[in-house]
């Protein structure tokens, strides 16, 4: 059974990245009978930030953890299992201060676990979350996929770097950009993103 992990992170009620990502996940599901969508609304249901208790607990084998430490890593363990079980991951975020939403960053902090999603070797770190396809839906008021503002887009390079570190390199970004350039530009950007979603679904 195929698993699609859907991660939405925008806190905005009028978010554009969220409905496009949801539509993509649902279309992929409809194209693959028997598949399931596991959704994490990271804005509506914020994850716990890592703290001293958490960082100490993950450095111990499970059997050596105290009851309090076990509770501290419970959510992280669930998130790691969801990530490893997923065949496809759909991520939505707005470009906030040139990067991803903090809610999505917290998810990353919870799933980047040595021994679970990556490991250290004598020749360097090796990602363990391999064999997955990722789609990133990125919304922004300006244009950051190309042109003079492209160097300010830290979201896509960061996601490619950190997901690559975990062993995930097959990543496509669906830009919904130029939304602040007026209604006509916004409509054009939304239509282009929806068209790409349809193309992806038909090819699935």
UniProtKB/Swiss-Prot annotation:
Its cofactor is FMN. It catalyses: 2 a quinone + NADH + H(+) = 2 a 1,4-benzosemiquinone + NAD(+); N,N-dimethyl-1,4-phenylenediamine + anthranilate + 2 NAD(+) = 2-(4-dimethylaminophenyl)diazenylbenzoate + 2 NADH + 2 H(+). Keywords: Flavoprotein, FMN, NAD, Oxidoreductase. GO terms for molecular function: electron transfer activity; FMN binding; oxidoreductase activity, acting on NAD(P)H as acceptor; oxidoreductase activity, acting on NAD(P)H, quinone or similar compound as acceptor. FMN binds at residues 10, 15-17. Its EC number is 1.6.5.-, 1.7.1.17. Binds 1 FMN per subunit. It holds the Pfam family Flavodoxin_2. Belongs to the azoreductase type 1 family. Quinone reductase that provides resistance to thiol-specific stress caused by electrophilic quinones. Homodimer. This is FMN-dependent NADH:quinone oxidoreductase. It comes from Rhizobium johnstonii (strain DSM 114642 / LMG 32736 / 3841) (Rhizobium leguminosarum bv. viciae). The lineage of its organism: Bacteria, Pseudomonadati, Pseudomonadota, Alphaproteobacteria, Hyphomicrobiales. The gene is azoR.
